[in-house]
Amino acid sequence: YERRAIIGVSVERSRNTKTSNTQQTIQFSVNHPTLQINNPRQEIKVVVLKNENWNEKITNLQPTFFKANQLLYTYTNKTNFWGDNEYYNFDTKFLRNRSLGIQQIEKKEVYHHYLYPENYNKYKKYTYFPDINGQFVIRTLEANDAEIEADYAMMHFSLNTYQPFSGKEVYVYGAFNNFELTPENKMSFDSENNTYRASFLLKQGFYNYSFATVGEDNKVNLRTINGSFYETENQYTVLVYYKSFGDVYERVIGVDTGFLDQNR
């Protein structure tokens, strides 16, 4: 992109007392000392993106303050995101041996890896454990070039619940399929064991995943199963687009990323 602006991003606990325990707010500035912006409300567009997931974004923001060569975006509520929770992890760098998150391995037409079941608890409290914000890294310790030599394993996911979530579908959710909801990662409910299950192939690597519900509004919801906490360490990216009068297309003139600092 064409770097014509310097972006400063701050991630904080929500300032709204009603959401201070469950949401995070993003404040940012756009500094443009070498770029003349005549009408920022028309020439500038911004996108705030959570964890590189285009399903979780905020747009249509206008500056709240104007300074010389600087635009400030200091909303109280409009740039709030749900904190959600840390992602679950597993590692399949070994096909034949158990690694992080793997409870059992079976050799069939391909290797089948059964993850430790997760348990639904509506009273779940926040517990820190490191993740990579829903992303994944292809890797194997059984070959030299993971990108072309890593193999596939059938991954088995399970979520123990007391009963099915009424009016909601449940999905395994993560960047492994670009945060999409497909028949492949949709979970089915095993009524005999009160367990949601899903199985699909994934290439060897280190993966983050979560569980998402989708109701009649067709909106992805990570809070139903995992809760939402202001402490969760999320990554937020601010992209700034510029289109002056007479330009044919918008240009990205600035990008920056911010993280929640739990020690703040």
Where are these regions (language model features)?
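Aromatic-rich carbohydrate-binding modules that target alpha-glucans
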Residues: 53-68, 156-203, 216-242
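Low-complexity, Pro/Ser/Thr- and charge-rich linker/hinge segments at domain boundaries
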Residues: 2-25, 229-254
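Basic K/R-rich, polyanion-interacting modules in nucleoproteins and related proteins
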Residues: 113-166, 253-264
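Short coil/turn motif common to extracellular beta-sandwich-like domains
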Residues: 19-27, 149-156
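Short edge beta-strand/loop segments characteristic of extracellular beta-sandwich folds
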Residues: 27-35, 156-162
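Long, internal scaffold/assembly segments composed of regular secondary structure
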Residues: 37-124
